[in-house]
Amino acid sequence: KELYSLILFSGTDPDPRNRDTSRQRPFIDSEFFNFSYGRAEDGDRVIDAQYATSTRYVSTTMHGNATMFGVNFADGRIKVYPIGRDPRGRTKTFCVLYVRGNPDYGKNDFVGNGDGTVTDRATGLTWMKVDSAGLKAGPRGDGTLNWEEALEWAENLEYAGHADWRLPNAKELQS
């Protein structure tokens, strides 16, 4: 969650075959953090700008390799990456940003509120325990909503004595 917290959702997704990055915007604030796209002269694609985390994935991927979570600031995705060899047989290398400070950052601290909601004391966010299907939300009454319907439903929702519900943003949903 630490590395994910640095993602800017205003980046542009590059064409991995295009070598010109002059009109691209990375998904990290390059005013504060050094960033470079993958370099063709190193045998990389433009999108080869994966940053490693210390969080291992519980299973394996790509030819049974052990895997860890990472963030790609070239294309704005959180992914799992093989630890060891890449699909081309090369030792997989990553960019790394080191962090210090609160080791409990990103750890949820849930408490049930007894009213069908849960508060995460770490973030201050209150979540509903049930999803839209449990509420029979939407025009079809089955909980399936398109994005516009979901926004409108949240705007008019009264639940557990509160009328200020909204859709979470991407970082809140990841929290």
PLM features: residue spans?
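Glycine-aromatic-enriched surface loops/turns that form tight recognition elements
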Residues: 2-166, 171-175
